[in-house]
């Protein structure tokens, strides 16, 4: 059995920087046609020149791959900088509530403040797409739910602004997407295939720790259902986020799952298991092209076959290792060719 996926798109990707970027980028740039690149680096991409420099770094270490750059929404963002980013072709604005995830200490402190709303009003006029890490302070399993009032305010106040709930993790958010025409979402492999049991049901597994947290069986099943039917308002976004094993085994564990090396085989396995392989093309590419109005992307064909694939336990970066999701396991699908 074989399947060919055309122009795979990852609508939420972390490729880090410097040596780590060089080590992990190929796992995404080779099989994927394009990816929305996250701006929460150690020095966040809060201005246009820095964002364009990072884009150039990615392009220098990849080929036939389109990085779709995003600007980090922060308290110091000005209307002039927003206009400058627009003029340089940056189409994505990434909003992190302050302190909610990795490198979000520079995030937005007042989500419904006058300045935030003014920036969003202008982002709407300029045609930006707002990608939001939709969590608010509160009990860890309710953080996304607690952000619903903010999402509703944004959706109603800016009806022409496309708003993406990044890495949807709570089944209660599905109703918002159905209710508001301008609300969309991305789904990760880990949120549609894993639950809290994978993180802490046995021994604590730091390599399954991410934000937002993987949640209950009900959440996983409801989100998986959206993916399997390729809901038209949902696109795939891996949120692949590599960290060194030495940091993952420390006393202060960073959030992030490195899934890039297994994405296409694991998705094929999951969709075949549920008799939905015919919908994988829409989930992995077609929906994103429509939602984000993407065209002129590098043409790419990823051919996969139903043959065993033993997942490497780790990737290497200098003298450090990066644990790969499901490392050491055997998947039933294998990436055979990229053209």
Curated annotation (Swiss-Prot):
Zn(2+) 2 binds at residues 94, 133, 167. The active site is at residue 239. Keywords: Hydrolase, Metal-binding, Pyrimidine biosynthesis, Zinc. It catalyses: (S)-dihydroorotate + H2O = N-carbamoyl-L-aspartate + H(+). The modification N6-carboxylysine is found at residue 94. SUPFAM superfamilies: Metallo-dependent hydrolases. PROSITE patterns: DIHYDROOROTASE_1, DIHYDROOROTASE_2. Pathway: Pyrimidine metabolism; UMP biosynthesis via de novo pathway; (S)-dihydroorotate from bicarbonate: step 3/3. The keyword Nucleus does not apply. GO terms for molecular function: dihydroorotase activity; zinc ion binding. Its cofactor is Zn(2+). One of its GO terms (biological process) is 'de novo' UMP biosynthetic process. CDD domains: DHOase. Substrate binds at residues 14-16, 40, 133, 243, 255. Zn(2+) 1 binds at residues 12, 14, 94, 239. Its EC number is 3.5.2.3. It is an enzyme of class 3 (hydrolase). GO terms for cellular component: cytosol. Homodimer. PANTHER family: DIHYDROOROTASE (PTHR43137:SF1). Catalyzes the reversible cyclization of carbamoyl aspartate to dihydroorotate. Belongs to the metallo-dependent hydrolases superfamily. DHOase family. Class II DHOase subfamily. This is Dihydroorotase. It comes from Helicobacter pylori (strain P12). The gene is pyrC.
